[in-house]
Curated annotation (Swiss-Prot):
The gene coding this protein: fluC2
Keywords, sorted A to Z: Cell membrane, Ion channel, Ion transport, Membrane, Metal-binding, Sodium, Transmembrane, Transmembrane helix, Transport
Organism of derivation: Nocardia farcinica (strain IFM 10152)
HAMAP family linked: FluC (MF_00454)
Catalysed reactions listed for this entry: fluoride(in) = fluoride(out)
Entry protein name: Fluoride-specific ion channel FluC 2
Length: 140
């Protein structure tokens, strides 16, 4: 029988970086949703744009921190887990789909459901590709 995997000790600096990034990301998302409110029964474009933009940004970030740059050890936890994790939102996306369905906007809900997933995946692919192209990482 193999020994159970050991969980590494929690690093206070990493936890702080994630917390600060997450707070900033959530604040940015809140401000965008305040500046771009969604009327009842309409597609929540603010959340859509936030999620797709965040997916593009995580694609760029992961190439930069894993393939192109030597970075500070706190950049990935701060920007990836914290900032972009706090900025994007799956729970709000799910709630907004339910809200659209309850308001009778079934086509909008289904379009938002599928469109977000497809656009988010495209965002990651495009972000990764753009970062590799811009840094020359694809040629290494």
């Amino acid at each position: 029988m193999s020994a159970p995997a050991r969980v590494p000790p929690l690093d206070p600096a990493i936890l702080l970086a994630i917390s600060l990034g997450g707070g900033l990301g959530a604040l940015l998302r809140y401000l965008i949703s305040t500046w771009w409110p969604t009327p009842p029964g309409h597609v929540p474009w603010a959340t859509f744009v936030v999620n797709v933009t965040g997916c593009f940004a995580i694609g760029v970030l992961m190439v930069l921190v894993t393939e192109a740059w030597v970075t500070h050890r706190l950049l990935r936890p701060f920007a990836g887990v914290g900032l972009l994790g706090g900025f994007t939102t799956f729970s709000t996306y799910g709630l907004e789909i339910r809200t659209l369905l309850e308001s009778g906007a079934v086509l909008e809900a289904l379009g938002y459901l599928a469109g977000t997933v497809l656009a988010a995946l495209a965002g990651v692919v495009l972000g990764t590709g753009a970062a590799r192209w811009a840094t020359g990482a694809a040629r290494r």
